[in-house]
């Protein structure tokens, strides 16, 4: 029985839910799912039932999360059309406590889209920080984000790139080298495509793309054009997904590492690349404590099995990767000097994670 060890994973893109959406997930269940999937750090997206946009909402999130988390947690500040007028004050008061600023430049869960040119210009101008501006973009809004980041020399982190034409566009802007542009890809865009009939459980934003796009994403991974893998873990209940208007989003924290290791076995990605995308690069981009996360590790055993829903720790209890064959099982996760997960059980105590 051969064991393998990897440094613990860092997820720059998780939706922990909680608040009025604690039927979908809570900080506790999200971070338990994270630990079971080999993650020691997740960064929470601000599109909560009430968005995290200022000192007050940031404080509420911290109060709610700190007693629950079993991994470390990062926070992003959000900005909505309603909060733009207070941008200067909010950014000044919150910049030190967050890992970056998230802007929804496309319609998605929560409905916090900012699409006025004036608002967007003001946001990019006012965020005078080296910490990245993260963008959810679809179609035309990607050009806008790239142009504004270049205009104000801001560090830009493009979430969930899913298509070949987006990669080409980003490449053009990168050649000018005026600012940092980091690119994230999700496990669902790497491992699923629009040919698979898994709707509504495969409905997310941006939607699953063609096999050609998927291949372009893998090529970009190999060529070094992708910086991180963000799970975009976005749980919704089974009932909601099966309703007449299913919400967009899929869970991903518990399946990403094993899927990547299967891809390694198939010769699609190297072990070094997996570590770069899930550990080294997120630590660098978000300026995290390298020593702490370098010491933490995930132990896996080589064993073929099918991904099953009844073993999941996420509260939503389903996965779009159901019944996919994988080649490794996570047996132990060591985090912060302790065994946090072992053989299906979470041993880490609620509240043991830190907000950083
Ligand atoms: O599919 C998605 N779900 N895409 C997003 O950008 C947001 C997320 C969510 O919060 O449900
Ligand atoms: Zn998004
Ligand atoms: Zn997201």
Walk through the language-model features, giving the residues of each.
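Short, acidic/polar
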Residues: 23-31, 82-94
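Metal-associated gating/positioning segment near the N- to mid-region
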Residues: 3-68
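His/Asp/Glu-enriched, well-ordered alpha-helical/loop segment
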Residues: 140-143, 148-153, 222-223, 228-230, ...
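Histidine/acidic residue-rich metal-binding segments in metalloenzymes
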Residues: 85-229
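A glycine-rich helix N-cap at a beta->alpha junction
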Residues: 63-79
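Divalent metal-coordination and catalytic microenvironments
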Residues: 13, 34, 38, 73, ...
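C-terminal cap of metal-dependent C-N hydrolases
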Residues: 295-356
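Short, surface-exposed connector motifs at secondary-structure boundaries
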Residues: 38-43, 69-73, 128-132, 148-156, ...
């Amino acid at each position: 029985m051969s064991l393998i060890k990897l440094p613990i994973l860092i997820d720059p893109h998780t939706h922990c839910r909680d608040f009025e959406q604690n039927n979908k997930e809570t900080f506790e269940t999200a971070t338990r799912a994270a630990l079971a999937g080999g993650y020691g750090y997740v960064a929470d997206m601000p599109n909560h039932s009430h968005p995290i946009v200022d000192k007050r909402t940031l404080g509420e999130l911290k109060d709610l999360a700190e007693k629950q988390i079993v991994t470390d947690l990062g926070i992003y500040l959000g900005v909505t059309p309603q909060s733009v007028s207070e941008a200067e004050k909010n950014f000044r008061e919150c910049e030190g406590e967050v890992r970056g600023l998230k802007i929804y430049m496309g319609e998605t869960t929560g409905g916090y889209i900012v699409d006025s040119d004036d608002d967007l210009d003001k946001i990019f101008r006012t965020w005078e920080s080296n910490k990245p501006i993260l963008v959810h973009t679809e179609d035309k809004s990607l050009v806008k984000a790239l142009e504004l980041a270049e205009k104000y020399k801001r560090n830009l982190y493009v979430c969930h790139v899913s298509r070949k034409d987006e990669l080409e566009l980003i490449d053009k802007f990168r050649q000018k080298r005026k600012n940092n542009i980091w690119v994230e890809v999700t496990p669902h865009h790497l491992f699923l495509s629009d040919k698979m009939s898994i709707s509504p459980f495969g409905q997310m934003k941006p939607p699953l793309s063609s096999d050609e796009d998927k291949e372009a994403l893998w090529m970009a991974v190999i060529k070094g054009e992708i910086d991180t893998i963000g799970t975009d873990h976005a749980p919704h209940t089974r009932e909601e997904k099966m309703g007449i208007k299913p919400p967009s989003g899929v869970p991903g924290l518990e399946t990403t590492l094993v899927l990547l290791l299967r891809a390694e076995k198939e010769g699609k990605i190297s072990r070094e690349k997996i570590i770069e995308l899930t550990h080294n690069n997120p630590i660098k981009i978000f300026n995290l404590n390298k020593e702490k996360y370098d010491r933490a590790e995930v132990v896996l055993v080589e064993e073929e099995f099918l991904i099953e829903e009844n073993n999941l720790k996420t509260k939503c209890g389903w996965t779009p990767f159901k019944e996919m064959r994988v080649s490794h099982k996570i047996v132990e996760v060591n985090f912060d000097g302790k065994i946090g997960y072992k053989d299906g059980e979470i041993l880490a105590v609620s509240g043991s994670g830190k907000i950083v």
